[in-house]
């Protein structure tokens, strides 16, 4: 099993699909990496030579992926929360950021329903 950027790439998949196992590499970026290195994107990972894998490692190393990308994303969200801007407040409250309605729906962001308080008669 090939290892690129600290991630095991599945052997039985094509190179383009296998590279998407790396956090921060999608289909389009995987194809660009394959084109830049000259590795055929429809070749299986198990059929790649050590030289091909080394080229892929070098090319993936030029892109922000895995832990660095996660850290950068987390820091961006933290920065918004520290600024106290609208998006930061919505992150802090766990509500949708981009203007979606919240009177109904938004369950993914808000979490499971909480029992309402019953009024005393």
From Swiss-Prot:
InterPro entries recorded: Rbsml_uS13_C, Ribosomal_uS13, Ribosomal_uS13-like_H2TH, Ribosomal_uS13_bac-type, Ribosomal_uS13_CS
Keyword vocabulary terms for this entry: Ribonucleoprotein, Ribosomal protein, RNA-binding, rRNA-binding, tRNA-binding
GO terms for cellular component: cytosol; small ribosomal subunit
Recorded GO MF terms: rRNA binding; structural constituent of ribosome; tRNA binding
Keyword tRNA-binding attributed: yes
GO biological process: translation
Highest taxon in the source lineage: Bacteria
Region spans: Disordered: 91-121
KW Oxidoreductase (keyword) present: no
Function: Located at the top of the head of the 30S subunit, it contacts several helices of the 16S rRNA. In the 70S ribosome it contacts the 23S rRNA (bridge B1a) and protein L5 of the 50S subunit (bridge B1b), connecting the 2 subunits; these bridges are implicated in subunit movement. Contacts the tRNAs in the A and P-sites.
Binding partners and assembly: Part of the 30S ribosomal subunit. Forms a loose heterodimer with protein S19. Forms two bridges to the 50S subunit in the 70S ribosome.
PANTHER family assigned to the protein according to its UniProt record, in alphabetical order: 30S RIBOSOMAL PROTEIN S13/40S RIBOSOMAL PROTEIN S18, SMALL RIBOSOMAL SUBUNIT PROTEIN US13M
Family assignment from sequence similarity: Belongs to the universal ribosomal protein uS13 family.
Protein name (Swiss-Prot/TrEMBL): Small ribosomal subunit protein uS13
Species assigned in the record: Cupriavidus pinatubonensis (strain JMP 134 / LMG 1197) (Cupriavidus necator (strain JMP 134))
Record gene name: rpsM
């Amino acid at each position: 099993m090939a290892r690129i950027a600290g991630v095991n790439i599945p052997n039985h998949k094509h190179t383009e699909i296998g590279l998407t196992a790396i956090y921060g590499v999608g289909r389009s970026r995987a194809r660009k990496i394959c084109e830049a290195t000259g590795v055929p994107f429809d070749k299986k990972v198990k059929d790649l030579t050590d030289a091909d894998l080394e080229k892929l490692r070098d090319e993936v190393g030029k892109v922000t992926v895995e832990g660095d990308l996660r850290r950068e994303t987390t820091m961006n969200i933290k920065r918004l929360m520290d600024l106290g801007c609208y998006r930061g407040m919505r992150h802090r409250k766990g509500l949708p950021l981009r203007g979606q309605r919240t009177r109904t729906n938004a369950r993914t962001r808000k979490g499971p329903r909480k029992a309402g308080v019953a009024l005393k008669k």
